[in-house]
Amino acid sequence: STSKYSEYVTRSWKHLVPVPSRMANLDRIAQLLCAYDVVGLQEVDAGSLRSGFVNQVKYLADNAGFNYVFDQSNRKIGMISQHGNALLSRIQPAAITEYKLPGLIPGRGVLEVRFGAGANALHVLILHMALGRRGRLRQFEFLAELVREYGYVIVMGDLNCGSDSPEMKALLAAARLRDPSPGLFTFPSWQPDRQLDHILVSSSI
């Protein structure tokens, strides 16, 4: 795990090759996930060199006791890297749909999971937005168009911007969503002072 900014440089090689400590981290994450019924994951590897050919999604599901699992590998670099979004659920989804997010650099997507049917269905969207503001604006417009007509929505993921950013405010208004936990800092992990990861919900929730 990373404990200071300099390690993004000194330990960047760990994103390309497997390291023993990664399994211990997965075990700790699996223990944490045991308390939840529906989990959205980002930047998980589906079984490539960088994860020691361990399907991290399946590993977490097996060790945390999830019956329903789906992964969306958005960036596949042969056997070197296969990472993307994933769903872990104890509740059986009625439908799962994959979307590719717009952007100059391909490799980002949305996983839409529907529980139930009709007007009372719950739509859960798992995603990881672009680093650049211009790219995020396009992706937020896509997301708003996708969920605007849904009655019950949960959006979860790394949105790479704070609740008070102009693009986030535009998304909340256009998609009729709200942030129930503004100011809940998530980054950097060792001393969080920025909110990049969010769970947004519709006003009906």
PLM feature segments, named:
Residues S1-N63, K76-G78:
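N-terminal, active-site-proximal structural segment of metallo-dependent hydrolase catalytic domains
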Residues H83, S89-A94, P106-I126:
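Beta-strand-turn-beta hairpins that frame and shape the catalytic cleft
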Residues S1-H15, T97, E112, A121-A130:
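Active-site-proximal beta-strand elements of phosphoester/diester hydrolases
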Residues F53-K58, R138-A144:
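Charged helix-capping and loop-helix junction motifs
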Residues L49-V54, K100, G135-L137:
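Short, solvent-exposed loop/turn segments at secondary-structure boundaries
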Residues S1, E43-V44, Q72-R75, I91, ...:
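Active-site-proximal beta-strand/loop segments in catalytic clefts of secreted hydrolases
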Residues R28-S51, V113, H123-L127, L143-A170, ...:
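Active-site beta-strand/loop signature of hydrolases that rely on acidic residues for catalysis
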Residues S48-F53, N67-S89, P106, N160-I205:
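Active site of divalent-metal-dependent phosphoester/diester hydrolases
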